[in-house]
Amino acid sequence: MSVQQIYWDLALIQKYNYSGPRYTSYPTALEFSEDFGEQAFLQAVARYPERPLSLYVHIPFCHKLCYFFGCNKIVTRQQHKADQYLDALEQEIVHRAPLFAGRHVSQLHWGGGTPTYLNKAQISRLMKLLRENFQFNADAEISIEVDPREIELDVLDHLRAEGFNRLSMGVQDFNKEVQRLVNREQDEEFIFALLNHAREIG
């Protein structure tokens, strides 16, 4: 292909040629403001009482910084910080869950950060807290993001026993040079072992 054959859509380039937030959530970060107070929150909660709930739990912790990562994160190897975070999360859940009484959870997703930063006891603690405060549909999708650098095979068994039935694995790239450049080096064989074990346990 010669340079003359390349079509440049200048309008499209100009439309997106600026720094802005990545689309990682809805509403996007720019939609949040101090103007959205408690009363507005309560009105939003009451707006669709017949709809099932989709819950997202953010686990911000990582053992190591990935250079490409733009979401909220705390890079630490101090495991007790996760316990402190779960303490705060418990207060928020106990305070807010009654607002959703009578509504069933059809989806739960743990994202991060690195949700598998949590140890087995912490995973069980959080799942128990969620089940005690929300009503889950029998066929609810319960998913988690898995970092293959931050998990052992037996943790998959623990996640399955806790009710997780879906996972997404953050491999990002198999190219070793790319992995080095983004500070996310990982064992390819172990990734496939994780995938195979996940299939085995359903």
How would you describe each model-predicted region?
Residues 1-54:
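Flexible, acidic/Gly-rich N-terminal and inter-domain linker regions that tether
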Residues 28-32, 65, 74-75:
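A short secondary-structure junction motif
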Residues 48-49, 58-60, 100-101, 197-200:
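Short glycine/proline-enriched loop/turn "hinge" motifs that connect secondary-structure elements
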Residues 53-54, 104-106:
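Structural signature of beta-strand start/N-cap positions in the alpha/beta core
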Residues 54, 67, 142:
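Divalent metal-dependent hydrolysis catalytic cores, especially in the metallo-beta-lactamase
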Residues 55-57, 169:
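Short beta-strand motif preference
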Residues 57-73:
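Local cysteine-cluster metal-coordination motifs and their immediate loop/turn environment
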Residues 73-99, 105-202:
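Conserved non-cysteine loop/helix-boundary elements of the Radical SAM core domain that shape
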